[in-house]
Amino acid sequence: MTVLDLSYNFANLSVHDLLEARDTYHYHLLSKANVVGTAIGLYLIRKDEAWPTRKGEGKTPPNKKTYARTLSNSEVRDYSWPCILAFVRSWANEDAFGPAGRYDPAQIVPKTLYLADGRAVPVCVVQADQAGSDTSATYSPPGILPAHKLGGGSPIIVRVQGAEYSATAGCLVSDGHLTYALTARHACGEADTRIFSYLRSGEVEIGASSANQLTRKPFSEVYPDFPGRRSYVALDVGLVRLDQVDDWTSNTYGLPPVGPLGDVHEKNLSLRLIDQPVLGRGATSGLVRGTIKALFYRYRSVGGYDYVGDFLISPAEGLATRHGDSGMVWHLDATTEDDAANPKPLPKRDLRPLAVAWGGQVFEESGVRSAFSIATSLSNVCKLLDVELVTDQSRGVSGYWGRTGHYSIAAFAVALVGDTDLRDFLNRNLGILSFDLDTIAEKGFDKSVGQLGDNFVPLADVPDEIWKKLDHGKNGREGGRDVSAGPHGSDGPEHPNHYADIDGEIGPHKTFRAACLADDSNLTVDAWLQYYETMAAKAKADGDEDGARRHRNKLKQGLLPFRVWQFFDAMVAFVENKDVVGFLTAAGAAAHYMGDASQPLHGSVYSDGDASRTVTRHHPRTGEDEEVSYGSGVHSAFETAMIADKAAQLFPLIKQELSGPGGHALPLLTSGKAMAKATVELMDKVAGILEPMRILDSYEQAGAGTRKATLDGMWKDLGDDTAQVMALGARYLAMLWESAWVHGKGSDIPVRNLTDQNPQDVRARYIQTSFVPSLTLDKIGDELT
């Protein structure tokens, strides 16, 4: 090449230049039967191509590879230049075109597109044959769902003409008057169609579809400064008008609190976005990760018009989007790393809501299918719908809604264990028992549990997340112990093991709880069965037939202290047999029950309100007043919503309660019956500190429900005492662990065996229904020693 020959500096090409070239050659590219799509991006270099050692070798390598370039065998490098990406069904070398070749020369994709003013735009040909997508008829959750708050990543369900359609709630937006969940239009239906979602307890009705929806817009209307004469920006975005905004958080489940909008427009949109990491949470796939592979992907042409998606996103291995993820928001990971060798954990990453996933493109290469996500700019969506992103709705709620109490009590208890070997063993396996306290206190929390499904679940939540489930069906779990399904969730023998309504008045004692503490003969299965029969007779005499049936129902007769007794016996046996996996599994699950015992509402007939009196509440959907029991809804508001919302303030108070010397400061016990009595003692203490009726009164006085004002009011009234009862729960749990360890002669187990355990070995134990089996009160006696 001489100084007089034309030389093109492709690195100076702008997004505008690339779009102008594609627009100019619109019909030319459209005529290529082999071309299935185009986009703009950076030139892809085959991964085994030698890196350039001299100037110019990047564009013209001395030993250039000629085999098919695909999305998986090529990459963007720091010297990649701007280009138009042309995706073709099949690959053919240049010699296959022409008189002696197999193909018409007119069908060859040009290497360069030349504009009238002398600019030249390179074309990068990529083999990426389109394939049909996988679909699923009904929604199936990817893992454990939130117990309480809905938010980004929650499923959106609509039923139209006998068919069910699912999508994902991407984020919350507001028009200044109402708040909406943004999702895919196809899961909204016509205006005012009722929309549903799912929590752990089952399906919930959340609102109605809005008439404000998007389908497609002319490219020139969305991007007036960019060329695109015969193109549509494809959109599939709808809004769900929420019945009760306080049921929602602006955060995405399992991700850090939502950051500021990743605002994209003609003036700042550049190819620097290529290869940038993004992540989101789909209702079907759970946590997904990817990278932005191309911009303005033309995926279809009809009647001479192109249909274009703003972003083509390549999935990370094993983390692709699927049917039901439409509506999900992709978050741009804009984190600045302080130490590249130790990247910041997910809760501390800087994520910016960037794009709404509305569709997918499946490419097939050598029989392997890869699902790419097509997404549109969230800033454009907000502009076209005339709404703004909501970032401050229940910001403190993110990650593990409903788990905070159980996990934190287990984490606090480990430090209180006196036996050095046992404490070290539990500390080494804290990730199996629970999470460390700093992680639990993070507003974003880590992603692990939210992605679990039928994989490993930290033990402190196994009784809720595994055993209180069916072992089959849509919301089933392997290892589930429930036996029947109903309109409000499933039921089975595990459920009554979590509580004991023993503050009913009986005999000379004010409560049956007091009678158990005063006389050990009341700590028998027969005495408890007689108590429930007495309560049933009393309810019937008062005209409360529902109450009478409840007290006689074997699945409603709470037996929490006997469940702790059963676990003490099991842990002792595991220690005696030197079965460290069995002991660890039982110890972690037992943390859940001692956590339940430390919550006053788990030991009271007022567990979710006082049925003997009613209050008038305004129904958010019907707009009408209704009569409900006094305190109805208090259980989840106090134990789930308030504790999760106030975790950052609660944990320092608990640490202060536990700051003195002496560990758990409780005597070690040597029998299951003594441990059952200690559990009743704990329930009595926490009821004295935080009387159940006081919780109900605070809830009603604060306005009921789970609005921020209600949670703030309850925290002001109950916060200090909540810390005190949770600290007691941690003390009694540490005492339970150490008592079983010492009584079973844990000192005989070689220290070399007290190592890090494999979570899958632990899971293999708890999915067995015979592992510390879940039994009703009338059946558990045979298990107790």
UniProtKB/Swiss-Prot annotation:
Its EC number is 3.4.21.-. It is an enzyme of class 3 (hydrolase). Residues 470-481, 491-501 have a biased composition (Basic and acidic residues). It comes from the Bacteria. Residues 470-503, 608-629 are annotated as: Disordered. Keywords: Antiviral defense, Hydrolase, Protease, Serine protease. GO terms for biological process: defense response to virus; proteolysis. One of its GO terms (molecular function) is serine-type peptidase activity. Probably a dedicated protease for substrate gasdermin bGSDM; cleaves the bGSDM precursor, releasing the pore-forming moiety, which integrates into the membrane and triggers cell death. Involved in defense against bacteriophages. Expression of gasdermin bGSDM and this neighboring protease is toxic in E.coli on solid medium. Belongs to the peptidase S1 family. This is Probable serine protease Ga0098714_109514. The lineage of its organism: Bacteria, Pseudomonadati, Pseudomonadota, Alphaproteobacteria, Hyphomicrobiales.
